[in-house]
Amino acid sequence: VAESTNEPGRATSVHHVVFAVMAEQLPETAQFFSELGFRFQTIELEDVGLRVLLDWDGGLELVTPLGADGSGEVAQFLQRNGPGVYSVVIRVDDAQAAEQVAQRYGSRTQFQQHRGGDGFELDEIEISVLGLPLTLLSTDLP
């Protein structure tokens, strides 16, 4: 096992798990997790065609496509696999540097975005590396 370094791109923690859910299953799925104690904030990301239910503190995110046209990564995932774990989000100090590390292991970048405003910055890069669905997240949010 290789020793970790203090190079940029270092992981700081597993941040949260993302489940892809069919639109018609979202209310019941959210209710189930709510009864377990999760508290979701709903975010409509029209620019990427997603409805997101996020419990940032609880470490859980539910995503479903907004449209019925079947386009987008989440819709394609659901068509191929049905509902399930879409990604495990790894918090890193520098998402771009972590992506470079992953590229040395043959990663494939599927999506990346930068969001900011209202006092926050967030960089997110979805990758597949060594067969694992991961998202690299660097942010100044807690």
How does the language model describe each region?
Residues V1-R10, S13-E24, R51-T64, E73-P142:
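Vicinal oxygen chelate
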Residues A2-T5, A68-A75:
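Short amphipathic beta-strand starts and helix->beta connectors
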Residues S34-Q41, Y105-T109:
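Conserved acetyl-CoA-binding loop of GNAT-fold acetyltransferases
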Residues R39-W56:
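N-terminal strand-loop-strand beta-hairpin
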Residues V1-Q31, L36, V85-V88, D140-P142:
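N-terminal beta-strand motif that seeds the catalytic metal site of vicinal oxygen chelate
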Residues P65-L66, Q79:
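DNA polymerase sliding clamps and clamp-related checkpoint/processivity subunits
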Residues I43-D47, G72-F77, Y105, H114:
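Short, tandemly repeated low-complexity microdomains enriched for cysteine and small residues
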